[in-house]
């Protein structure tokens, strides 16, 4: 049995779980998320806890049990507290600002980069060189952060570019004669 999958998920106040037609949906103060449940995994909802068990004793069922438990745990956390990723812009003239729901980035190109935010994901710019991406869906928040970083990833000689706030860029030494 999966060690991750064996652990029950405690539902915090304000979170509701519904299982219908092979789809598990979690509703909370920050929205609603749903996830199809694989046929090799059984879900039990008792009081304020969720437990997952494999439908049979195959390796695939054990692996999917842990996967489904982790995905649903992220959904529960997302609809109650939410997820966020912080990005920093490092470089002369690099700045970010919000234009409605879109993010306008000046990253040293001859043009401004406009990044549209998908549904359920919001961006904030506390300063011109900081971006905070928030949302209930962990996968979407991480994907948007990766897309913004991909416009200008940190380069290895000066460290200029868009980086995660907790990212450490290892700088290379320049070529010597």
Curated annotation (Swiss-Prot):
Keywords: Ribonucleoprotein, Ribosomal protein, RNA-binding, rRNA-binding. PANTHER family: 60S/50S RIBOSOMAL PROTEIN L6/L9 (PTHR11655), LARGE RIBOSOMAL SUBUNIT PROTEIN UL6M (PTHR11655:SF14). This protein binds to the 23S rRNA, and is important in its secondary structure. It is located near the subunit interface in the base of the L7/L12 stalk, and near the tRNA binding site of the peptidyltransferase center. Belongs to the universal ribosomal protein uL6 family. One of its GO terms (cellular component) is cytosolic large ribosomal subunit. Pfam families: Ribosomal_L6 (PF00347). Part of the 50S ribosomal subunit. The lineage of its organism: Bacteria, Pseudomonadati, Pseudomonadota, Betaproteobacteria, Burkholderiales. GO terms for molecular function: rRNA binding; structural constituent of ribosome. This is Large ribosomal subunit protein uL6. The keyword rRNA-binding applies. NCBIfam families: L6_bact (TIGR03654). One of its GO terms (biological process) is cytoplasmic translation. InterPro entries: Ribosomal_uL6-like (IPR000702), Ribosomal_uL6-like_a/b-dom_sf (IPR036789), Ribosomal_uL6_a/b-dom (IPR020040), Ribosomal_uL6_bac-type (IPR019906), Ribosomal_uL6_CS (IPR002358).
